[in-house]
Amino acid sequence: MITIDKILEILKNDHNFREILFHEHYYYNWTQNVTFNALSYDSRQISSDTLFFAKGATFKKEYLDSAITAGLSFYVSEIDYGADIPVILVNDIKKAMSLISMSFYNNPQNKLKLLAFTGTKGKTTAAYFAYHMLKVNHRPAMLSTMNTTLDGKSFFKSHLTTPESLDLFRMMATAVENQMTHLVMEVSSQAYLTKRVYGLTFDVGVFLNISPDHIGPIEHPTFEDYFFHKRLLMENSNAVVVNSQMDHFNIVKEQVEYIPHDFYGDYSENVITESQAFSFHVKGKLENTYDIKLIGKFNQENAIAAGLACLRLGVSIEDIKNGIAQTTVPGRMEVLTQTNGAKIFVDYAHNGDSLKKLLAVVEEHQKGDIILVLGAPGNKGQSRRKDFGDVINQHPNLQVILTADDPNFEDPLVISQEIASHINRPVTIIIDREEAIANASTLTNCKLDAIIIAGKGADAYQIIKGNHDNYSGDLEVAKKYLKR
């Protein structure tokens, strides 16, 4: 519940209030008592006591008209649509929605310890490590790209890396109702660009890495803009953890100089001194030997990042150790074995940098033929297509099958051809993803060989023309073709 007086107070304090406009009259205050028992940005979810946010570049007046027909009596907007109900006019609808949602749900962020991860890659894995560390002796909730849990028992698929602010604070409130003590979440650059976490301060923020990604017409116009929005997490955290090996580390180091911080990686005190496939040793604040199920040194580095963050939250080394040993992540380096001994690796690697690291890990363990099944999503991250080609060109013996990966409103054949245009040798294009995996499964001969299925991980859908069409998932499809 929230009153009109409280809403106006919030907006005025944030210098985000213009006026209330009703029947061509302007109001700085509203003398009538009005209470809202629901918030919505979806015109299909409206009741008479709902406060509606008219937001988005594609918003149309007919959406508002539909909401008014359903009983809407007040809305918030940057634009006066000339409707027959009062409008609270603001300078920034996204800021308004975040702060009003925060208050509506009784400031749940103050009742949880908040841990956030940002980075081009590794956010989900690091979040899972932290979740398992905290779970040993606490009650963490988690919002991740892969899965969300608000009670530690039931999990559901997330549609955005970081939810819309209204949904975010509703989820936090549910976690509080479920007596959760901590919230682990991923914070994307888009979350700051679209102000989904506006006004939110995290107890610990972690910056894992940075490389060009999410650059395109509907995302970030330049790498500089992408990097800037990533760094905003540092300015909105009470303590930070940063990878000293990341590109452009110096500016981040300067930015966090006066914030309590820990660095990890080769240029810090917190460093891996010994790395095996399923164990590693760390010196520094986390000094110990750790068992780990996820192969690859980059996963060990993600574990260190999560461990340092949890240490800041009061988690013991023993709980950190147990958490790392227990962590698995759906769609991250999941391994199957064909009857001929060849390995199939299913991984979410979905940009050039993560593909590069995935190939390095697989090639370290598999010395025979390696077949890569790969695609790129439509209508976002166009720069990935060239990045994939550049990485593939560094592996001349890699056999490549290009396929569909969430083509959305683009033609998957055109996407595949664009990737192929950046590759300096012939590749195979099989648009049907299951058919591509089936074809790859016929190309192995012995235990030294491997198939890498990259991009979708555990996603049990294909995004086609705006819809989430059913798809068994790469792991389930691969299981059909183990006999060789």
Curated annotation (Swiss-Prot):
Its main location: cytoplasm. GO terms for biological process: cell division; cell wall organization; peptidoglycan biosynthetic process; regulation of cell shape. It catalyses: UDP-N-acetyl-alpha-D-muramoyl-L-alanyl-D-glutamate + L-lysine + ATP = UDP-N-acetyl-alpha-D-muramoyl-L-alanyl-gamma-D-glutamyl-L-lysine + ADP + phosphate + H(+). Pathway: Cell wall biogenesis; peptidoglycan biosynthesis. A motif (L-lysine recognition motif) lies at residues 405-408. ATP binds at residues 119-125. UDP-N-acetyl-alpha-D-muramoyl-L-alanyl-D-glutamate binds at residues 43, 161-162, 188, 196. It is found in: Cytoplasm. Keywords: ATP-binding, Cell cycle, Cell division, Cell shape, Cell wall biogenesis/degradation, Cytoplasm, Ligase, Nucleotide-binding, Peptidoglycan synthesis. Carboxylation is probably crucial for Mg(2+) binding and, consequently, for the gamma-phosphate positioning of ATP. The modification N6-carboxylysine is found at residue 230. One of its GO terms (molecular function) is ATP binding. It holds the Pfam family Mur_ligase_C. GO terms for cellular component: cytoplasm. Disulfide bonds: none annotated. InterPro entries: Mur-like_cat_sf (IPR036565), Mur_ligase_C (IPR004101), Mur_ligase_C_dom_sf (IPR036615), Mur_ligase_cen (IPR013221), MurE/MurF_N (IPR035911), UDP-N-AcMur-Glu-dNH2Pim_ligase (IPR005761). Its EC number is 6.3.2.7. NCBIfam families: murE, PRK14022.1. Belongs to the MurCDEF family. MurE subfamily. Catalyzes the addition of L-lysine to the nucleotide precursor UDP-N-acetylmuramoyl-L-alanyl-D-glutamate (UMAG) in the biosynthesis of bacterial cell-wall peptidoglycan. This is UDP-N-acetylmuramoyl-L-alanyl-D-glutamate--L-lysine ligase. It comes from Streptococcus agalactiae serotype Ia (strain ATCC 27591 / A909 / CDC SS700). The gene is murE.
